[in-house]
């Protein structure tokens, strides 16, 4: 039996673990936080839009336009929806965004967690992978738990650590270092799907208000991007799907 070590127990890590175990692999999942799927709970404003039905090349912005399609053609929205139905999570379509019927991100987290348990996958919480060493056959992973060092041997390693976008959820950038040690090149990253801060001081007095509107990004009297939908006013500025859609232009 092939052994697969997965670093990170977010949405990608748990899905990879379930897929590998369902295909006969022995799986161990290493997660340095105290629970799995922590960042999932924040997605979609706590409702978790886990896929979308509109997937077109114009939606993906990259110097390598074909890159996303290598993945999407193998695992598309229909397959994602089917996967969650098999786990007991049925989807509702809201303008192309697919949410769990409960409108609770915790439904997604719990479904994935229960499937890990059903498949008896070895999930090790508060366990950090500090280094990976390739061997002639497989890999040696150096781990630390409660200050004690250890080693794990695996035939395959799947790195699912995420970026450094949300350290409080576990996405602290530690995966970049592991990737570099394995010879991968890290492309400089910029915020691409984030809230926007505003200079005006009145936002604190209207924090929590939701309103339908249009948000636009301007530079040198030129509109770079705009989008319409539900805006969420926060104590620091604006959030919501339209803001996320245009935020990458602010980062650039």
Predicted regions and their residues:
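Short beta-strand to alpha-helix junction loop
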Residues: 68-76, 95-114, 166-171, 201
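Predominantly flavin-linked oxidoreductase catalytic cores and closely associated redox partners
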Residues: 114-252
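Residue-level detector of alpha-helix initiation sites
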Residues: 6, 10-11, 35, 163-165
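Glycine-rich active-site loop/strand segments that organize a redox cofactor
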Residues: 45-95
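Redox-cofactor binding/interface segments in oxidoreductases and associated redox assembly factors
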Residues: 7, 42, 159-160
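Glycine-rich FAD pyrophosphate-binding loop
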Residues: 21-45
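N-terminal Rossmann-like FAD-binding beta1-loop-alpha1 element of flavoenzymes
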Residues: 2-29
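Mobile, glycine/GP-rich and aromatic-enriched active-site lid/loop segments adjacent to catalytic centers
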Residues: 86-114, 118, 226, 241-244
């Amino acid at each position: 039996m092939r052994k697969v070590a997965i670093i990170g127990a977010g949405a990608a890590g748990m899905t990879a673990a379930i897929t590998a175990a369902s295909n006969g692999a022995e799986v161990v999942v290493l997660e340095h936080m105290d629970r799995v799927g922590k960042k999932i709970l924040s997605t979609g404003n706590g409702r978790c839009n886990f896929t979308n039905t509109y997937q077109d090349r114009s939606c993906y912005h990259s110097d390598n336009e074909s890159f996303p399609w290598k993945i999407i053609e193998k695992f598309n929205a229909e397959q994602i929806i089917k996967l969650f139905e098999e786990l007991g999570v049925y989807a509702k379509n809201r303008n192309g965004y697919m949410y769990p019927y409960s409108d609770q991100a915790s439904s997604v987290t719990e479904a994935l967690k229960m499937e890990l348990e059903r498949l008896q996958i070895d999930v090790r919480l508060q366990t950090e992978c500090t280094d990976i060493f390739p061997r002639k056959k497989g890999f040696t992973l150096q781990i630390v738990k409660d200050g004690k060092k250890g080693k794990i041997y695996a035939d395959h390693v799947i790195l699912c650590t995420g970026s450094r976008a949300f350290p409080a959820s576990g996405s602290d950038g530690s995966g970049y270092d592991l990737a570099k040690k394995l010879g991968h090149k890290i492309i400089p990253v910029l915020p691409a799907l984030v809230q926007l801060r505003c200079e005006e001081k009145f936002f604190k007095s209207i924090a929590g208000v939701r309103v339908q509107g249009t948000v636009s990004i301007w530079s040198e009297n030129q509109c770079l991007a705009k989008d319409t939908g539900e805006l969420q006013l926060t104590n620091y500025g604006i959030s919501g799907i339209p803001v996320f859609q245009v935020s990458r232009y602010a980062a650039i």
